Curated annotation (Swiss-Prot):
Name under which the protein is recorded: Vacuolar protein sorting-associated protein 16
Alphabetically ordered keywords of this record: Cytoplasm, Protein transport, Transport, Vacuole
Additional note from the record: Present with 1300 molecules/cell in log phase SD medium.
Pfam families found in the cross-reference section: Vps16_C, Vps16_N
Organism encoding this protein: Saccharomyces cerevisiae (strain ATCC 204508 / S288c)
Entry keyword annotation includes Transport: yes
Gene coding for it: VPS16
Assembly behavior: Component of the HOPS complex which is composed of PEP5, VPS16, PEP3, VPS33, VPS39 and VPS41. HOPS associates with phosphoinositides and the PX domain of VAM7. Interacts with VAM7.
SUPFAM superfamilies: 3-carboxy-cis,cis-mucoante lactonizing enzyme (SSF75011)
Predominant cellular place of this UniProt entry's protein: cytoplasm
Task of the protein: Essential for vacuolar protein sorting. Required for vacuole biogenesis, stability and to maintain vacuole morphology. Required for growth at elevated temperatures. Acts as a component of the HOPS complex that acts during the docking stage of vacuole fusion. HOPS is an effector for the vacuolar Rab GTPase YPT7 and is required for vacuolar SNARE complex assembly. It remains bound to SNARE complexes after vacuole fusion.
GO cellular component: CORVET complex; cytosol; early endosome membrane; endosome; fungal-type vacuole membrane; HOPS complex
A GO MF term: actin binding
BP terms from Gene Ontology: endosomal transport; Golgi to endosome transport; late endosome to vacuole transport; protein targeting to vacuole; regulation of SNARE complex assembly; regulation of vacuole fusion, non-autophagic; vacuole fusion, non-autophagic; vacuole organization
Length: 798
């Protein structure tokens, strides 16, 4: 295998090389043609067409310039590789190739001034030389040259990158910031005729009169100066740190200390393009990539190198025939560094044979390291990257690893999708095992299929999309809503609806159906997935879009037995009233009025309506009972009004129990008997209410008198319990002896619980229960010495 270093050139301590990456296959019989390069494609203007090719010379798209109806003064690619056509009055951005889609960004008033030049999103006007920046689809004024601060004679007199614009005035050099338009004078009283700025801000100036190059980042510190032997055809950056000049059929790279290296080509050099890590050279027959040789690659292939990478490759080459010697070599260098160098060099190579050899050497070295001392993922990731880069190259996309890192895998996919190269995209996604990107490719294919198939019926298109969908089985990564939106914009509403129903994301699916005004389907889908928050959100949106009657109809049809929205609207009495009235739900409507009456503290005014609503329902025992209760309530209100007039006390909104309690509390025995008789209150309920009321009113004497007045129908335990639960322990003790059927132990326990220790001692003494007395003695608090003495005295008597 030929050593690749034989084709290298050395510039001081750095090696450079030029590698062919493609042959030009467009029609070359025309002498007059213009071309523009991007990272992955070439645009060529021949006669009345601009044709776009990949680096294999495959035609990807073309534009008939006669249909533009304006003279094209320039064309170039932007960072996303959209083709930009520059005319005097506008720029035209090619958004799509099949069908051809062009978006125009015109000047505000082309009658006042016209476009002079354009590059990398920056535009200069012809008369004023005002500077504009393309911001989305609008022009943003960066600097207005109203004082004629500078005058640019040719289009070589300016250059720009993402951060700065360099302007070569007749006498000075200016810099304009692309972020705020600030103008700065870099160099005064200095004349230059060409400028180019690198992506990292290094500036190269060329003076045609003196045939001199000057390179700097800060004008106060000149990095390099070169006096050239002849006038270059073009000047361009090779990467970010070396300047290249083209001279007919050769390229010269200039380094420090007046050094340079020359690369000769068998054909005339026509165009140059600076890349992040090198230079693309276009000749009349081929495309070359000129770049720095990475240190790892240089260490391995440099003649006589004893670096770890070179030693590992030597050892691997001897392994088959001279294994002992190969193993001995492994002991003479840092093996891990050799493995890493071979991996890095393999990624840097274009030739598969060299890649394979270097990876085999790295694998051999890795296997010779101690177990788990090397991160195997480095090797695996390198292999995957090399496979991807080789796959790209097989499709006519020649990327270095540095360029690939800059644009990412999705960037490669997007560039292929521009030209509808779906097969290549799918192959790349499968190789990279990128399920999400595969779904993205399918989504873009489906969108383009809809746009490009005006003669196909909706059902036919849907079947086509579904059949492709079943093959790739990537429904979890698809954005079917995006496809549905395209169908909607194309006027295919039924197709849009059916595609939206294929969307896996619930919120996106419902939103698209809502936007299509398929309210019923959207609501059914919400209910189907049982996403209650989403259902409520949809219904709120629908309530703003539909009338009340339309929304009610929707709820009746699709949510007849689902009270979710009614529960959400439970505080909106006006809505509930309207809904129940429209749906003839009389009982629910009565409940709304009942609640409204309670909230307004005027329930009696709503009662006739409520009774009338209940009467609409026939043959219902529950309804009949409710009507009886309402009549009873109405009767109570009338009685409460009479009581209020008689005693000047408000009984409004009191329940029957509260009314009775109030009468008991105020000592209105006559009215108590009257209300008991009038509303047929049971004796047991009366006793409970009176007992509870007197306890809460702390009328203990009256309570005891009430308890002793006659035999209680509820017994006397409730008296004891009410007093004890309210904290009136000392008042509860007398009722223990009234409770019939209690055993000695039960009575003693009740006395102790209500702290009736004296009664408990007397009871235990009567029963001659010394253990019980001791138990009581131990429970008596220390601050009750009299009770303790009584307990001792009682025990001594026994």
């Amino acid at each position: 295998m030929k050593n690749p270093s034989f084709d290298w050139e050395r510039l001081k301590d750095v090696f450079y090389r030029s590698r062919a990456i493609g042959e030009l296959k467009w029609p070359t019989q025309y002498e007059e043609f213009k071309c523009a390069l991007s990272l992955t494609v070439i645009a060529v203007e021949i006669q009345d067409f601009i044709q776009v090719y990949n680096y294999f010379g495959q035609l990807l798209g073309k534009i008939n310039l006669q249909r533009i109806h304006e003279d094209i003064i320039k064309f170039e690619f932007d960072k996303d590789e959209k083709l930009i056509l520059v005319t005097k009055s506008s720029i035209k951005i090619v958004k799509g190739w099949s069908p051809l889609t062009i978006e125009s960004v015109p000047l505000q008033d082309p009658t006042i001034d016209t476009i002079w030049d354009y590059h990398n999103g920056i535009m200069l006007l012809a008369k004023s030389r005002d500077i504009y920046k393309l911001n989305g689809n609008e022009w943003e004024l960066l600097y207005e040259n109203k004082d004629k601060k500078y005058n640019l004679l040719t289009k070589n007199h300016w250059s720009c990158n993402d951060d700065s614009i360099i302007l070569l005035d007749v006498d000075h050099v200016y810099q304009v910031s692309t972020s705020n338009g600030a103008l700065l004078k870099l160099i005064t009283d200095s004349s230059w005729h060409k400028v180019t700025i690198s992506s990292r801000g290094f500036i190269c100036l060329y003076n045609m009169k003196d045939n001199k190059l000057q390179i700097f980042r800060d004008p106060a510190r000149i990095l390099m100066e070169h006096n050239l032997d002849s006038t270059p055809d073009d000047i361009c950056w090779c990467g970010n740190d070396t300047v290249a000049c083209s001279f007919e059929d050769e390229i010269k790279l200039y380094g420090p200390d007046g050094l340079y290296v020359t690369f000769w080509y068998p054909f005339t050099v026509t165009n140059l393009r600076a890349e992040v890590d090198g230079l693309k050279v276009i000749t009349t027959e081929k495309i070359y990539f000129l770049s720095r040789v990475q240190p790892q690659t240089s260490n391995i292939f440099r003649i006589g190198s004893t670096e770890p990478g070179a030693m590992l490759v030597d050892s691997f080459s001897l392994l088959e025939d001279h294994a002992p010697k190969a193993i001995e070599i492994l002991k003479n260098f840092v093996l891990e560094k050799g493995v890493l160098d071979c991996i890095a060099a393999a990624i840097d190579e274009f030739e598969p044979k060299l890649q394979k050899m270097l990876l085999n050497a790295a694998s051999y070295g890795k296997a010779s390291l101690q177990y788990k001392s090397f991160d195997a993922s480095i090797f695996v990731n390198a292999c995957n990257t090399i496979k991807l880069l080789n796959c790209f190259r097989s499709f006519g996309i020649f990327l270095t690893v540095e360029e690939y890192r800059c644009i990412s895998l999705k960037g490669v996919i997007d560039r292929l999708l521009k030209y509808h190269r779906y097969y290549e995209c799918i192959q790349i996604c499968k190789l990279a095992n990128e399920r999400f990107l595969l779904g993205y490719v399918f989504t873009e294919w489906a969108k383009d299929k809809i746009k490009g198939s005006p003669d196909m019926e909706d059902d036919e298109l849907l079947d086509k999309i579904k059949s492709r969908l079943s093959v790739i089985d990537m429904t979890d990564t698809l954005q079917m809503v995006a496809v549905a939106k395209v169908a909607y914009l194309e006027g295919r509403f039924q197709l849009s609806r059916n595609l939206a129903l294929l969307e896996k994301n619930e919120e996106a699916r419902i939103e698209q159906l809502y936007n299509l005004d398929d309210d019923s389907i959207a609501l059914k889908e919400c209910i189907k997935v049982q996403n209650y928050s989403l259902t409520i959100s949809l219904l709120i949106a629908l309530s703003k879009k539909l009338t009340n009657s339309q929304l009610t109809k929707l709820l009746i049809i699709d949510m007849f037995n689902n009270p979710l929205y009614l529960y959400y609207m439970r505080m909106d009495k006006a809505y509930l009233y309207d809904f129940y009235r429209q749906t003839d739900r009389f009982i629910d409507l009565a409940h709304v009025l009942l609640q409204q009456g309670k909230e307004q503290q005027s329930l009696h005014s709503f009662l006739p309506q409520i009774k009338d609503l209940y009467s609409q329902v026939q043959n219902s025992e529950v309804v009949n009972n409710t009507i009886e209760q309402l009549q009873r309530q109405e009767k109570l209100w009338i009685y409460q009004e009479s009581l209020g007039k008689r005693f000047a006390i408000s009984f409004t909104n009191m329940t029957l129990d509260q009314t009775l309690s109030k009468l008991i509390e105020t000592g209105q025995d006559k009215q108590v008997k009257e209300i008991v008789k009038k509303f047929k209150i049971s004796e047991k309920k009366l006793y409970h209410l009176k007992c509870k009321t007197l306890v809460e009113a702390k009328k203990f004497d009256e309570l005891l008198q009430f308890a002793q007045s006659r035999k209680s129908p509820i017994g006397y335990m409730p008296f004891y319990t009410y007093l004890k639960s309210r904290g009136h322990m000392d008042k509860a003790s007398p009722y223990v002896n009234m409770i019939p059927g209690l055993s000695y132990q039960e009575k003693k326990k009740l006395y102790v619980e209500c702290r009736g220790f004296r009664d408990a001692i007397q009871l235990a003494g009567k029963e001659k229960d010394i253990p019980g007395l001791k138990e009581i003695y131990n429970i008596i608090p220390p601050n009750e010495p009299e009770l303790k003495a009584l307990a001792n005295e009682t025990m001594s008597r026994i």
